[in-house]
Design a protein with these regions (language model features):
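Ferredoxin-reductase
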Residues: 1-99, 158, 184-188
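Conserved S-adenosyl-L-methionine
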Residues: 119-120, 143-151
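Histidine-anchored nucleotide/phosphate-binding helix
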Residues: 131-145
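A short, basic/flexible loop-to-alpha-helix module at the beginning of a structural domain
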Residues: 94, 107-119
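Phosphate- and divalent-cation-binding pockets in alpha/beta enzyme and binding domains
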Residues: 114, 133, 242-246
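Reductase modules of NAD(P)H-dependent flavoproteins
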Residues: 150-264
Length: 264
């Protein structure tokens, strides 16, 4: 996406939540923006720049392009209890400032994060904003191709407040018996009321721990032929490194390991 020369005042940003994603909670993010004084921030961009984002939309959605963007704030000055005098993220500030009907310039898609055409089992792992290409792949696999391949998606976050699209994937799981969706929280909060699943088919919300270790402990250690699985992943750099090592440890050949390294 292109970011032209511009100045963005965060006071002008509309943070009302999406009615389809957060029904009945239009001011869901207001408290957090108030608490951290995001309204005081200003972004100034002095030259035309481009930033790359993973696409969350899939081909059947046509010209509708969906991006998952996390606002990039300056470092926090603990002594002053305020943001440091550093420019906020140029691209995220620009995107957050856009309103329905505004025009932007986008090119692509680029990259090599493609679905391998085979009948092999597919294991997806996503973390944080790495949800974007997961949605694109999985919606294309099931909503368009109606695939019969065995597929699982393991999604990791610190707490429930970091999760999104979960209801969409739970619906996908109900529609397709060959798809399983699991969540792992590394630091569940008290208000999450997180109940730990007793095994893959047990009751509960999900697992506790880092998502790569959750996959190992609950699935790959019991799999008859993990080396035959295709592994797809996208997330923060440390998660990506852990998944790459996991795949190698279980004998998955490099050509069957694919990732979208948005954090690199």
């Amino acid at each position: 996406i292109e970011i032209p020369e511009c100045e963005i005042d965060f006071k002008d940003i509309n943070i009302d939540s999406h009615p389809e994603e957060h029904p009945g909670e239009p001011k869901k993010f207001q408290l957090e923006w108030d608490k951290f004084k995001l309204w005081d921030l200003k972004m100034k961009n002095t030259e035309l720049v481009e930033r790359a984002y993973s696409m969350a939309s899939y081909p059947a959605e046509g010209k509708e392009i969906m991006l998952n963007v996390r606002i990039a704030t300056p470092p926090w000055d603990r002594n002053a209890n305020s943001w440091m005098n550093v420019n906020p993220g140029v691209a995220s500030s620009y995107i957050f400032s856009k309103k329905p009907g505004d025009k932007v310039t986008i090119s692509g898609p680029f990259g090599e994060f493609f679905i391998n055409e085979s009948e092999a089992e597919m294991l997806y792992v996503g973390g944080g904003a790495g949800m974007a290409p997961m949605r694109s792949h999985l919606y294309h696999l099931f909503r368009t191709l109606k695939t019969g391949r065995k597929v699982s998606f393991w999604y990791g976050g610190r707490s429930k407040r970091e999760l999104f699209y979960t209801e969409h994937f739970k619906a996908l799981e109900k529609d397709f018996p060959n798809f399983k969706f699991y969540i792992a929280l590394s630091e569940p909060m008290e208000e999450d009321n997180w109940t730990v699943k007793d095994g893959l088919d047990g009751k509960g919300d999900g697992f506790v721990g880092f998502v790569h270790q959750t996959v190992i402990d609950n699935y790959l250690n019991y799999h008859e032929s993990p080396e035959d699985i295709e592994v797809y992943f996208c997330g923060p750099p440390l998660m990506n490194q852990a998944i790459e090592k996991m795949a190698d440890d279980f004998g998955v050949p490099p050509e069957n390991v694919r990732f979208d390294d948005f954090g690199g």
